[in-house]
Structures are given as structure tokens and as C-alpha cells.
A protein has these predicted regions:
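C-terminal catalytic and target-recognition region of SAM-dependent MTase-like enzymes
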Residues: 308, 335, 349-414
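S-adenosyl-L-methionine
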Residues: 272-310
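Conserved SAM-binding motif I beta-strand of class I
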Residues: 263-268
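Non-catalytic accessory regions of SAM-dependent methyltransferases
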Residues: 1-122, 150-151
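Mobile active-site "lid"/loop adjacent to the S-adenosyl-L-methionine
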Residues: 273, 309-339
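Conserved class I S-adenosyl-L-methionine
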Residues: 239-246
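Non-catalytic substrate-recognition/targeting regions of SAM-dependent transferases
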Residues: 106-119, 135-150, 165-222
């Protein structure tokens, strides 16, 4: 595989290919012809039907997305390029006042690095390479991270080198165990790419100290796309009976308990997640009732028991990864919200979220409205939730906007 492509190989796209309308992907069905015999993982040229260059892309014939553009110019994937793109991503987050030591530093196409995810937790970095071309170059990417955040060029972001000259990087953890890698023909694996093998780290959100295992914990360590929402929801928790559904490791439950909730119950069916949540509850001196059970089963049982809550949080995993599963996903959301509405007190609050890209914000809102009708309840919409600013949305790539959420207040006497 020619990592240093001479750009002789490439693809000519069909006239109506989405890449001609601002997207950065080329699907196999959008290819007019392939020229120059590119190898999987190569950098290739993209051209339109008039032989005009429309950019440089990474190539994988085994993927449904056969090419992913990373530049509109002729550009190879070398160390200088990775350093430049990562620096640009870090500078964007700095302008948006994102905490530089607790953020997603790079988010794939949103930062011009298709398939690359870099998260930062203090002095530890977590790297995912979800496309073949980027996986072949993960050592280059790791070197770029070291150069930017630990080497002579660490002045890129002010304060990255600690007092006394200590480096601002202890480890780079590889978390390439995401199933989506299989779509690129890649194996699943995780390990240490650079630095200290001790990768438990600690950080604070909404007054709660979280300790996470970057090598063995969920995904890349934490749900950073919800980082600001934990604080927002917790601001409504004081004095309320809180139910956190699909609690995972209990970030909502713990921040609500820290904010003064009268009672907090966290429902999660994964015992390892509950163990991690209990560990963080104990180290913060917080009281949470952990319930290891399927959420739908719990909600049905709670309704029979005539339980009531003043704040319910619904933060389920994606209900569908494909467009074909949309109908079933909407049915699931409708039932989930119906069950929740039946448990809310007369002026209770519901914070509900969806991370399913194929479920549009309009469709999500409609399922909530339908569930309100079914439950014979009325509610006011207090606010929308969005993915955090370190997960940028590109209007020309709809797939970058996957997250939506709503905060509702029930209306008494209706």
C-alpha cells in the first residue's frame, strides 16, 4: 500500500454524486470509473466528469464509502499535515472556550480527518482510527500528538507545558475496539501507543470527580458530547426525586445527587457500568440507588407500583444504526416516553435524548408529542439540548449532526 501516493490513481465521480454538493464522501454507487489501480488505504485524486480535480481522498474498495475527501487540494497524509489539522482543531475549540484538557480534540470529518477521533482527559489522549487509511498512519498521528502537546511546539496551546517543564502528555491510548471498524475490514483492538500504561484518570464535571479507565472503560472513556448537558440537567435536580434511565456509569445520576436531589435512582442493565458508577459515588460521598434491570421492564413495574418522580432522564443508546430500522426505533421511543410520562409528577421534568442519526429532530419531537397524547398529559418545552461544541456540525455533512434532546415540564391540571 502506497502511503506516499503520487496522485496518479483516483476516482471519477458520477454527475450527481453528493461530493459535488458539499459532502466529503463518495459511495461505491457514485463512482463513474476508477483509474490508476489504487490500493486500499491509498491517498487518491477525486475528479469530476470534466477531469477537474475536486480533492484528495482516502480510498477503500471494501467499504460502502469508497472514498472520503480530506482536502480540496492535492495533499498527502504526512506528519506536517496531521500536525496542521490537529492544531487547527485545537485552536477552534480554544476559540469556543472548550476546556482544552477535557474535550474531543478531533472529531473525524468535522475536523478534516475522516475516521480519526482524539479525546483528551488531562494528560492522557485516546485515539481511534476508524478508517483503513488512517489506521495505517496511526503512528504518524500519535507522533503529531506528541509533537503538539509534549514537544517543542507545545506552545501551540498556551499552558500545555506544566511548570518546571514537565510534559503535558502521559499516554496515548488506542481504543480501536469500535465495531464500526469492521465496515473498513479492520480488526478490533486496544492498547497503549505511547507513554505510561497506567491509564486511569480523573476529571471533574458539575462538582463531581470522575475516575475512568481509558483502556477498558466504555468507548473512548466518557460521553463528552453530553458534557455540558450534565451540568444543565443537574441545575434542575435540587429537592427532586430523580430517575436516571439508561444510566451507564451514572453521570446524570451523580451530578444530580451532587446538586441536591432528594432521591436518585439509576437504572442500568450492565453490571460493569453499575460497578463503575458505585465507585465514583463512593469517592464523592454521594447516595444513589443503583438498579440493575432493563429500563422498559423497570418502567412497566414502576407504573404498576404507582411510583412517581419529579425529574426523569432518558438517555438511551442508539435505537437504530440504519435507515431501515427507523420505524422500529420510533416505536421504541414512543413507548419509552409514554412510560416516562405516566411516572412524572404533576409539574415534573423530563430530559430526553437521542443519539440516533437516522432519527431526525422533527421525528423525535413527534414521537414525544404522540406519547403525550397517549398518556393524556400536556407539557411545555423548556429548551433544546445539542451535542457539545467539541463535536462540530458541518451543514454539508448531515451525519455530523446526530444528537438531539429536549427538556420538558409537565403542565398540571390539564
Amino acid at each position: 500500500m502506497d502511503v506516499g501516493s503520487d496522485f496518479m490513481a483516483g476516482i471519477v465521480v458520477k454527475p450527481r454524486a453528493r461530493i459535488l454538493h458539499g459532502h466529503d464522501w463518495v459511495f461505491s454507487s457514485e463512482v463513474l470509473k476508477v483509474f490508476g489501480k489504487p490500493a486500499d488505504g491509498d491517498v487518491i485524486s477525486l475528479k469530476d466528469g470534466r477531469d477537474r480535480l475536486i480533492g484528495s481522498a482516502i480510498y477503500n474498495s471494501k467499504s460502502q464509502i469508497i472514498a472520503r475527501r480530506f482536502s480540496r487540494q492535492r495533499q498527502d497524509l504526512d506528519l506536517d499535515f496531521f500536525k496542521r489539522r490537529i492544531a487547527q482543531a485545537a485552536e477552534y475549540r480554544s476559540r469556543r472556550h472548550v476546556d482544552p484538557k477535557l474535550c474531543r480534540v478531533v472529531w473525524s470529518e468535522s475536523d478534516g480527518l475522516p475516521g480519526v477521533i482524539i479525546d483528551r482527559y488531562g494528560d492522557h489522549f485516546v485515539l481511534q482510527t476508524l478508517t483503513l487509511a488512517m489506521d495505517l498512519r496511526k503512528d504518524l498521528i500519535a507522533n503529531a500528538i506528541v509533537d503538539l502537546f509534549c514537544g517543542a511546539s507545545a506552545s501551540l496551546a498556551k499552558g500545555e507545558v506544566e511548570a518546571g517543564g514537565a510534559p503535558a502528555l502521559q499516554s496515548i491510548v488506542e481504543r480501536n475496539d469500535a465495531p464500526i471498524r469492521r465496515a473498513e475490514g479492520l480488526e478490533l483492538k486496544s492498547g497503549i501507543l505511547r507513554g505510561d500504561a497506567s491509564v486511569e484518570t480523573e476529571f471533574q464535571i458539575a462538582g463531581v470527580r470522575f475516575a475512568i479507565d481509558l483502556l477498558h472503560g466504555q468507548k473512548t472513556g466518557f460521553y463528552l458530547d453530553q458534557k455540558t448537558n450534565y451540568q444543565i440537567v443537574a441545575e434542575h435536580a435540587a429537592g427532586r426525586r430523580v430517575l436516571d434511565c439508561f444510566a451507564d456509569e451514572g453521570a446524570f445520576a451523580l451530578t444530580c445527587a451532587r446538586a441536591g436531589a432528594a432521591d436518585v435512582a439509576a437504572v442500568e442493565e450492565n453490571s460493569e457500568n453499575i460497578a463503575a458508577g458505585k465507585h465514583n459515588a463512593e469517592r464523592n460521598g454521594l447516595k444513589v440507588r443503583w438498579i440493575e434491570q432493563d429500563v422498559f421492564a423497570f418502567l412497566r413495574a414502576a407504573e404498576k407500583a404507582e411510583a412517581q418522580y419529579d425529574l426523569i432522564i432518558l438517555d438511551p443508546p442508539s435505537f437504530t444504526k440504519t435507515k431501515s430500522g427507523l420505524r422500529d426505533a420510533l416505536r421504541g421511543y414512543r413507548e419509552l416516553h409514554l412510560r416516562a410520562f405516566k411516572l412524572l409528577s404533576k409539574d415534573g421534568l423530563l430530559a430526553t435524548f437521542s443519539c440516533s442519526h437516522h432519527v431526525s429532530e422533527a421525528a423525535f419531537a413527534q414521537t414525544i408529542a404522540d406519547a403525550l397524547v397517549d398518556a393524556r398529559r400536556s407539557a411545555r418545552k423548556l429548551r433544546r439540548f445539542e451535542q457539545a461544541l467539541d463535536h462540530p456540525v458541518l451543514p454539508t455533512i448531515p451525519e455530523t449532526e446526530y444528537f438531539k434532546g429536549i427538556l420538558l415540564e409537565m403542565m398540571p391540571g390539564r
